[in-house]
Amino acid sequence: MAKIDDSVKKKVPELRFKGFTDDWEERKLGELGSVAMNRRIFKDQTSENEEVPFFKIGTFGSKPDAFISRELFEEYKLKYPYPEIGDILISASGSIGRTVVYQGEDEYFQDSNIVWLKHDDRLNNKFLKQFYSIVKWQGLEGSTIKRLYNKNILDTDISIPSTIEQNKIGMFFERLDDTIALHQRKLDLLKEQKKGYLQKMFPKNGSKIPELRFAGFADDWEEHKLGDYIIQYSEKTKQNNQYPVFTSSRNGLFFQKDYYKGNQIASEDNIGYNIVPRGYFTYRHMSDDLVFKFNINDLADYGIVSTLYPVFTTNEQLNSKYLQYQLHEGSEFRRFSLLQKQGGSRTYMYLNKLQNMILNIPKLEEQQKIGSFFQQLDETIALHQRKLDLLKEQKKGFLQKMFV
């Protein structure tokens, strides 16, 4: 690819394939085609028992929950507009601008809510798909309207190169999208594998042993009161900004300035905040949906959190990583959380309540193996997530530089 000098004020992208130098042409989508949609389908024409999927705006891009008869489908497909293979279907309401490539399956789409541009051979669909991912629809900027009308589509500006260059650009992004999709599938598979292991490696339904365990371990897990294993840490700051401020979230523990993108929202006076030493737990003690996340400080030797976030550590008989997974994924904590809910919508999990919970716990060596296993699995998942995020950022950069 050749990079174009920024000083050259021409209708060309910053980055393009070698051999292409002509200006891109400015057009409106309405000059290149017209908006098409399927014939209206009424509710009494749909059923869960018919043969042909009927996609409404709520199921567009996912699984259908309504179907039409084969006879009606064939009649309407013959008489009224119907997409061709490769056409880019667009959501015109709800989440405006979502796209699905029509692959040729027998299926029908809700009129006016799902549309496509019926265009001539001046437009390449692969190129058009990528354009849709960055387009600013005419007339919708700053609007609160949640509908994309035909006029919005037809009046939208587009800059296009030759069809040969369009095809090269479209193929480039198609390969990149395929790579992103492959990494997404790998990531999803790892997450599913973790979910399966979590279900099998902790006892459930009153059992004293898990369904799946490491070789060499056969003893029953024993019931223990968690308070026998965890120790509250009550040290508080004595001066302002004594240590970095943490945010303990459902996605992990973060420096607050990173979590809020450069801003620190804690009180300017954080004297009296709880101190969190490295390796210690902290968590938000209240929840509206029975979900609590117990985060371990692996960011700094010391950090601080609001007094709404208790701090504790484990003694030498309980592996902290093992405990973290058991609290997040074990059935005992979910049941215990439900018991703490006393009217209203909010559940409070004070540390003294947590200390009263009864857990089935294996010997320390087995704890360590379980904790290490899931930690390694999480690190693998995080690595795949970083790769996926990088690919998405690379695509974003290419889109900015390869379109006018």
Each predicted region: which residue ranges?
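Non-catalytic DNA-recognition/assembly elements of restriction-modification systems
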Residues: 15-39, 213-237
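Short, charge-patterned binding micro-sites
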Residues: 27, 105, 208
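Short, recurring structural edge motifs at helix starts
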Residues: 1-5, 14-19, 41, 139-145, ...
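A short glycine-rich beta-alpha junction/loop motif
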Residues: 9, 92, 108-114, 143-167, ...
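Short amphipathic coiled-coil heptad-repeat segments
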Residues: 1-21, 185-219, 386-404
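DNA target-recognition patches
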Residues: 30-33, 43-74, 230, 234-266
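Extracellular/lumenal glycan-associated surfaces
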Residues: 19, 167-179, 183-186, 222-224, ...
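A short beta-sheet element
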Residues: 56-57, 67, 71-133, 149, ...
